[in-house]
Every structure is written in C-alpha cells, then in structure tokens.
Amino acid sequence: MTHMTSSNTARSAEWFEKAQKLTPGGVNSPVRAFGSVGGQARFIEKAHGSTLIDVDGNEYVDLVCSWGPMLMGHAHPAVVEAVQKAVVDGLSFGAPTIGEVELAQDIVKRTSVEEVRLVNSGTEATMSAVRLARGYTQRSKILKFEGCYHGHVDALLASAGSGVATFALPDSPGITGAQTSDTIVVPYNDIEAVRNAFAEYPGEIACIIAEAAGGNMGTVAPKDNFNDKLLAIAHADGALLILDEVMTGFRTSYRGWFGVDKVAADLVTFGKVVSGGLPAAAFGGKAEIMNMLAPQGPVYQAGTLSGNPVAVAAGRASLKLADESLYTTINANADRLHGLISDALTHEGVAHHIQRASNMLSIRFAEGEGHNFSDMKAADIFRFAPFFHTLLDNGVYAPPSVFETWFVSSALTDDDFSKIEQALKPAARAAAEAKAS
C-alpha cells in the first residue's frame, strides 16, 4: 500500500531501521509499527500539553494520549513536580510506602472496590484478577467476549470459533490449546449467548471478564444494561464478574465506567490513568475476595516493582487533578472532535458512524452503530489508512488502527481544533476516494 508521507521523516526512518535490527518489528508494542495502516512510524522525542514532537521536529495534535492516560495532556507541571520529588527520595524500595496506601485510598474513594493490590501493568492486573476469581470460586472456566482485549495473558488471548458459545482457539502462536481450553468466547453485547454458555456449563465458570466498555474493537459501549445483566447471571451461578477498567478507569468519568453505569463488579482492573502514564496498574474488589490473596490467603501474586514510588506519585498527582470539572472539559472536547469528524466525512459523502463510550470514540466506516466485533469488522475498513495518513501528514496524530480508540485531553486548544478541522478536510476526501483492494 502506498501513502503520502511527510516531507521530513528522515530521522524517524533512520531510527526505525536501527530499531528493526535490535527489536522485533522495530517496536516494543505492535500497534506502534503502523502495521495496519502502512507507512513510516514516527519516533516521538518529546511532548507538552496537546502536542507531540517527533525526532524530525514535526509537531502533531495528539489524539492518542498514550492510549488513554494523559487526561491533562503531556508533562503537566503538577505531575512532573510530583515525579521529580519522588525520584529525589529513591526509585524503588521493595518495601511498603505511605504513597501506595494513599493511592489505594484514592481508588477506593472513587470506585466500588473495597481493597486494592498494585501491580506493574494492565496485563498483570487482569491475569491476577482471573487467578483470584478461580481461586475464590474453585472453578476453572472463564467467559470472555470477542473483541475485548485484556492484555497478553495466555488464557485471554483467544478468539471465538463457530457457534454461539465455544471453547476458543488460541489467538497467537506460542499459546497452546490447553492454555485456552477453559476459555469460552461469546459475542459482545449478546446476553443470550452468555445465558446459553452458563446453561451449557452450570457450576463450572469461575468468572465473566469484560471490558467495562469496549475499546479494542473500536469503541463499543455496552448496551441495554449489559454489565448489570452480566453481574446478575454470574451471581446466579456462583461466578464472579471482572470488569476491565484499564482503559475506562478514571478516563470516562471521575469514577471511571462505574460512574457511568453504577455496576459494582466483584473485581475491577485499573491502569493507564491510575499511574499517570508510568508503568503501573491495579486491581481491586470486594474485601472477602481480595483477602484470598497472599500473604493473607492462598492465592499467590507478587511483584518486585509493584507499588513503585515514582509511578505511585504520578498516579496520585494525576487523580488529584482529575476532578469533576476536568471531565466536563474532556467530554466537551470529545463532543467537539466527534462533530468535526462527522461533519467532514458527511461533506464528502462517506458512510460512517462515530462510536462513543463517554469521551472515548472511534470511527466505523459504515452506516449505523456497531454493537460487537463482527459489526465493527463489517465496515469499509480500507478507508481508514488513507484517512489516517492524511491526518498525520497534516499534523494530527490519530490512532494507527481502525480498531483502536481515540482519546482527547483537557489540554486541547481552539488552535488545536482549528488544525484538526483543516486536516479533516483532505483526510475525508482521501477516505472518500479510497478503493477496496
């Protein structure tokens, strides 16, 4: 596939060539390689507020926000100050700190969870939550949803086979059938498929795990009280509900997705915002369940860098800034971006629907809202790559995949929106002119 490229990406190209000799694919997380859109990945040198600056000096309005955590934009002075103070006092202790207790208090105050365990990544959080659910229920099977991503945990990297509910086939080489043999996958937003799975395996399912709102098949919100119904079905069979709020937690509202639908899941995972953009995450839930964890209980979970004081400082500073007024601004910015994208695509006659889950959004290049992964794949996906690259070449950094969510920060300015509006005009034309290969 051929794409227009910026006139100045020489250093990004040079560093990407070096990286490919040292790192698989030249990146440390696959989506960064621009694999689904083609073209030259940009190497970012620094960022301030709403602006990314690459190694060639090109500036971009940031609509990725490091995949969610940058609520206030990049390098917010209060977060930077908190990190600087923490660094001076030591990088890691391998011992309890006051800060980690205070961060746990912040999480408990804003959500439904009663106790919290800090970990190092969203993957660790979901892996640990599933282990805990299995230990608590003394059951093995788990139920997840097609298109919901929960990190690169072996049992959760699975895609659905044929039928309403089926044992999943592994979705990556290196994951054996045995590792996913207890994983059941059903379509998202399909409550009957969930009921059928529990009817087929009564008393065998340890937990349902779902993104609180889908953000990895594009943006797909739960419909018709879906999460509440999941909780009821799980509890009726003695199973638990895990809601994955790694993406939505403290991003979609002051209380995360819990603030949107008020569903108090048995276990909840957090990441991204909770660490202020540094490598940390958490999971929490009802005290009765959490107390099954070592050293209090028999379910083992540990981490040398868990509760890292620098990451904790960044997370606490970010949550302190994330008051209700901040979400008013972020929601307004998401609405404004939504309108600009839709207006530009409508002007060019491009069939589309802007998918929303609070202030998270994505584009479905087809008429009507998508409610599951099949819906999101049944669109003119070929239109996204030229749309993306035209935005990029006009100074707007959007997610480099049609199946990723767009994020806004409170740092966006009127000038940023003017730049976005101007970039969307040629981008929408490029989408309109795109042809399926």
Curated annotation (Swiss-Prot):
Keywords: Cytoplasm, Isomerase, Porphyrin biosynthesis, Pyridoxal phosphate
InterPro entries for the chain: 4pyrrol_synth_GluAld_NH2Trfase, Aminotrans_3, Aminotrans_3_PPA_site, PyrdxlP-dep_Trfase, PyrdxlP-dep_Trfase_major, PyrdxlP-dep_Trfase_small
Chain ranges passing through the membrane: none
Residues spanning the signal sequence: none
SUPFAM superfamilies for the chain: PLP-dependent transferases
GO BP terms, alphabetized: protoporphyrinogen IX biosynthetic process
Known EC number: 5.4.3.8
GO MF terms, alphabetically ordered: glutamate-1-semialdehyde 2,1-aminomutase activity; pyridoxal phosphate binding; transaminase activity
Pathway where this protein functions: Porphyrin-containing compound metabolism; protoporphyrin-IX biosynthesis; 5-aminolevulinate from L-glutamyl-tRNA(Glu): step 2/2
Residues with the N6-(pyridoxal phosphate)lysine modification: K272
Family in the record: Belongs to the class-III pyridoxal-phosphate-dependent aminotransferase family. HemL subfamily.
Protein's name in the database: Glutamate-1-semialdehyde 2,1-aminomutase
